[in-house]
Amino acid sequence: VTSIAAESKFVELVRGWLVSLPHDLKIAFDAMDDENLPRPVREVAAGVIAYVVSPNDFVSDRHDAVVSYADDAVLLRLALQKALGPGEDEQSFRERFPELFEGLEDNLTLCKSIMGELMTWLESKVATLPTIEYKGKKITKYLDDEEAREQLFEDGLVFRTDYPVDEKTITDKLKKATTITDVMKRRQAEEARAKGVKARA
């Protein structure tokens, strides 16, 4: 059972992450393009960019549209946190972006305490990020092919331009932790259903 204080802190946190998602996406692009970072880190960064900018059609209700980015916002931070190891270059990358990495471990622990197995579901996605396909191309292609990278970058710009979340919309729409977890549960169920359909095909 989580305390009211933890729950309101979680809501506050996710609100902030939702507002900063376009900025955080730029940090993921920086990680993807940073040749000093180990290749696996860059692949995770590219994968999480593709995950975030892919349209998620399952949320048709405008009211939920804002909150439907919550899994993207949490996954982006989770992926970068998990991918970046203790190496010197990785450490200096973290230091360049304190707004994303400072206190992140504690914040993710807070998310886990509220989200429970939904957090486990997101954690399990991190390992699959480098293997996803985006617009018919493998993620590695976006690292190795200039034209593909340009396309991903353009899609990132479009995403940031069209992103419907700001301080005002988020304060109106997001007041309770269950608002976030309910939408994530639907996303998880939708994904499981899609996998089931694929498996039967």
Predicted feature residues:
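Long alpha-helical, hydrophobic tracts
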Residues: 1, 17, 29, 38-43
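Polybasic, low-complexity association/targeting segments
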Residues: 1-23
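Alpha-helical phosphate/pyrophosphate-handling elements in metalloenzyme active cores
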Residues: 25-35
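Transmembrane alpha-helical segments and their cytosolic interface motifs
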Residues: 33-53
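Membrane-inserting effector segments that mediate pore formation, membrane fusion
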Residues: 47-76
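Membrane-interface alpha-helices
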Residues: 65-96
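Intrinsically disordered, low-complexity, charge-dense segments enriched in Lys/Arg
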Residues: 101-201
